[in-house]
Amino acid sequence: RNGLSSFAPALKWQPIENVGNFSVQSAFHIPIIDKETDINGVFLDQTAFMFQNRFFYDYTLPSGKWQLFTELNTEYNFGEKDSFANNTFVLAPGIFMSYFPNDKSTILGFVQHSQRLGLNDKAFTQDFTAVGFGGKYQLTEVLNLEVLYSKFVRGTATGLGESFNIGLRALF
């Protein structure tokens, strides 16, 4: 599967001036697809709109080679179209441990959980836990290459499996 499924303008800021390792990112996801599945029934993405807030905190160990990174993701999903995600709230904590072998590379491992709560009796409720590992490499001052493997180890109202992701990230 590949393609564009949503457009998401985002804003990231540091809400507490003297706490540089805590930040918040807010985004508004606008779906640009009409159907959540392809002709073979494979899930592509939700067609719900989403307001998302992500809270980040990191701690670098004294050696400077290791970093503990935590994230709390919250999502409110809504819209007029039929979507499994409409009228749901997601609470998703994650913890990542990164190792920096040099100034351009990162190797990481993680555990994440996602809890989707239906906000009415027609809404979809779901949860899952994933573990995984990956890496990042800084190609230029602006462009990073990222790879990630995730194994979904448990869940309710979801299929278990794994995912392989590769991406380019531009940081301006």
List each language-model region with its residue ranges.
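Residue-level signature of outer-membrane beta-barrel architecture
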Residues: 13-15, 57-61, 97-99, 137, ...
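Outer-membrane beta-barrel "beta-signal"
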Residues: 8, 137-138, 160-172
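Repeated loop/turn-to-beta-strand initiation elements of outer-membrane beta-barrel proteins
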Residues: 19-22, 63-68, 103-109, 139-147
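Flexible, surface-exposed loop regions and adjacent strand-edge segments
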Residues: 40-45, 86-89, 125-128, 163-167
